[in-house]
């Protein structure tokens, strides 16, 4: 398997016997080079000594030497700087575009690495590397968690950057879309993002001082001001209480004024949702947040502490929703503030990644550093992923740790990408 051969070369998991080319010249690996995952040679800028002469260039790796021709490398000038061709089976000589024969070296994947890799790929246990985790050094765990935490923030930065592009380059709008997405808290996240992209924020800004009009636009664009979206047994009550009709009339006026089109309300998911998470409640909280001018990027960037972030993101519903979860359904009075857990998730998934992304965009490292510091101050998430890692023996002390472990599961374990994982590395090289 070529991937394992790459791995053996990259990590110098080499036999103890002397390495030689197929024509008997001694090979010494000074630097295996930089692993290239894109088009071109497999390793850039490697340093190898062949019969005492130092060669600096690229290394290409194949299962069989004849793959050189099958892949067309003999006609590709990008491979002219290859100084060593490494193969498990050397079944022929190879030449570059200039007709020069390349030095070749036979290399086999050590049997224990092959066996360990098969275990990782075939076991039904999850995570497959669970047996080795208690034996990992603190340094290994700490350095890997730090790298994963950065990866997680970088991935979220890419998402935010794409939203900014969809918003015509507006990072202010991208923040609103990101905030709205995370108000979906998983089940309705995609729908909230679609909804936010359908909100003409420049138009809404003209009515920013009127909470009722903001809520009318937010509810209307969500498609929730059509009578057939109200459960049948509540429709008459919704018409009688007056608020539904007032919002609908206001929205119809504003929709005509700003040429707005509502989204399809069928996109909203109500199944298995607690009433506290119903779209009506979250939209009212968002309207209040927007009305209080707490949904802006400039306010976020000014936050330097967890308490300031909590104050910024805290919101509650408008008076009607204190006694309702949907139109027409009367309930006990409750101001419906965002819970502590919801605030925590908004800080972890919205505010802190946005600080990091803005830091990258503006080349302000202090904002990136602040994002890391804030993550370390927050309590970790409590979900099935985190509990799984805790049972395996990994420490979870902060939101930084929990984000790192979510990244580990989603980007490595779920994809069985053990060859890029540092825990996988420890598992593969262990002799058992």
Regions found by a protein language model. Give the residues of each.
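N-terminal accessory interaction module
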Residues: 44, 54-55, 60, 66-94, ...
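Cysteine-cluster motifs in flexible loop/terminal segments that predominantly coordinate metals
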Residues: 403-432
């Amino acid at each position: 398997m070529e991937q394992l051969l790459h791995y053996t070369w990259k990590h110098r998991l080499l036999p103890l016997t002397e390495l030689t080319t197929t024509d008997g010249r001694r090979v010494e690996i000074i630097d295996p080079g930089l692993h290239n995952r894109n088009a071109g040679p497999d390793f850039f800028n490697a340093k190898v000594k062949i019969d005492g002469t130092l060669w600096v260039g690229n290394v290409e790796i194949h299962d069989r030497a004849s793959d050189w021709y099958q892949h067309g490398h003999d006609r590709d000038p990008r491979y002219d700087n290859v100084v060593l061709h490494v193969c498990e089976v050397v079944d022929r000589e190879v030449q570059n575009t200039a007709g020069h024969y390349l030095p070749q070296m036979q290399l086999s994947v050590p049997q224990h690495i092959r066996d360990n890799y098969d275990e990782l790929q075939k076991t039904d246990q999850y995570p497959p590397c669970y047996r080795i985790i208690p034996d990992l050094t603190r340094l290994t765990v700490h350095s890997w968690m730090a790298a994963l935490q950065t990866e997680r923030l970088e991935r979220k930065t890419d998402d935010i950057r794409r939203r900014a592009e969809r918003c015509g380059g507006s990072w202010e709008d991208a923040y609103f879309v990101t905030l709205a997405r995370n108000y979906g808290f998983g089940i309705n996240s995609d729908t909230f993002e679609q909804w936010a992209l359908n909100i003409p924020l420049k138009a809404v800004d003209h009515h920013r001082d009127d909470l009722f009009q903001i809520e009318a636009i937010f509810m209307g664009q969500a498609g929730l001001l059509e009578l057939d979206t109200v459960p049948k047994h509540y429709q008459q009550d919704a018409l009688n209480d007056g608020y539904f009709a007032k919002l609908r009339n206001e929205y119809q006026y504003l929709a005509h004024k700003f040429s707005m089109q509502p989204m399809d309300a069928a996109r909203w998911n109500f199944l298995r949702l607690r009433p506290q998470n119903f779209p009506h409640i979250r939209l009212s909280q968002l309207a209040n947040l927007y009305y209080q001018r707490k949904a802006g990027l400039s306010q976020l960037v000014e936050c330097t502490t967890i308490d300031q972030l909590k104050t910024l993101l805290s919101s509650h519903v408008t008076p009607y929703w204190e006694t309702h979860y949907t139109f027409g359904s009367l309930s006990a009075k409750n101001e419906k503030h965002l819970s502590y857990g919801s605030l925590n998730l908004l800080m972890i998934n919205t505010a802190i990644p946005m600080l990091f992304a803005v830091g990258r965009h503006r080349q302000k490292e202090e904002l990136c550093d602040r994002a890391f510091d804030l993550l370390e101050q927050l309590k970790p998430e409590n979900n099935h992923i985190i509990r799984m890692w805790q049972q395996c023996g990994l420490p979870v002390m902060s939101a930084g740790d929990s984000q790192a472990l979510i990244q580990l599961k989603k980007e490595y374990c779920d994809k069985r990408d053990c060859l890029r994982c540092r825990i996988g590395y420890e598992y593969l090289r262990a002799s058992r």
